[in-house]
Amino acid sequence: MDLIIKPTEACNFKCTFCSSSKITDVDSTAQLDLFKIFRFLDRYPNTNTIIVNGGDPLMMGPKYYMSLIEFLDKNDYPATVALTTNLWPFMVKPKKWLPVFQNPRVGIATSFQYGGGRLKGDLSEFTEEDFWKCSDAVLKHCGYRPGFIAVIVEENEHTVIKTVELAKKMGVVCKVNYAMASGEQDAPYVKGKRYKHYVDIW
């Protein structure tokens, strides 16, 4: 069994297609209490993976994840921690995150797609060049390139094959997801179109 958590809805990016939902309608700064995770793990000690989504998980700071790792180590629980992050905070300040990223329990994944909808905090586009820099930072400090998720929307549907070719060039796996009607994304990507893309990839 896996546990999927969302510690925060905060994010350093402003992606136009974001389907991340709110933790609460009352407080956008709300954070998931670690003790709730600890109670779950005590009840289900054989949990395989703790999958961390966002917002962006790195908005929590390293201490949050080190406390979780210390709890797992103390109780000899087998769970690994899978972080899916845009990697920008790590690329800017890698030393800050090395204790988390280099921990053997932790695996890193990221996200990227073409089309201009992936925007940094200053609303400038997160480009392929930016993506390579973030991926290179993980390769340099952790010894591997992270796989990534790409989201299909109307604006970038013509770049799906290009995205798969990028993953091949990087030597990683790319998971091509369709946009869902959630969060800032007000309409799902049409089912018939996404199946056509999957056939084209195949």
Q: Which residues are covered by each model-predicted region?
A:
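Active-site neighborhood of divalent metal-dependent phosphoester/pyrophosphate hydrolases
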Residues: 55-57
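A C-terminal junction/extension of Radical SAM enzymes
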Residues: 182-202
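Conserved, mostly hydrophobic/aromatic
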Residues: 11, 15, 52, 83
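Short acidic/His/Gly/Ser-rich catalytic and metal-binding motifs that mark active-site loops
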Residues: 13-17, 117-119, 184-186
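Radical SAM/AdoMet-radical enzyme domain recognition
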Residues: 37-51, 61-183
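Catalytic metal- and UDP-sugar-binding loop of GT-A-like glycosyltransferases, i.e.
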Residues: 5, 52-53
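Alpha-helix N-cap and loop-to-helix initiation/capping positions
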Residues: 27-32, 60, 122-130, 190-197
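Canonical Radical SAM [4Fe-4S] cluster-binding loop centered on the CxxxCxxC motif
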Residues: 1-34
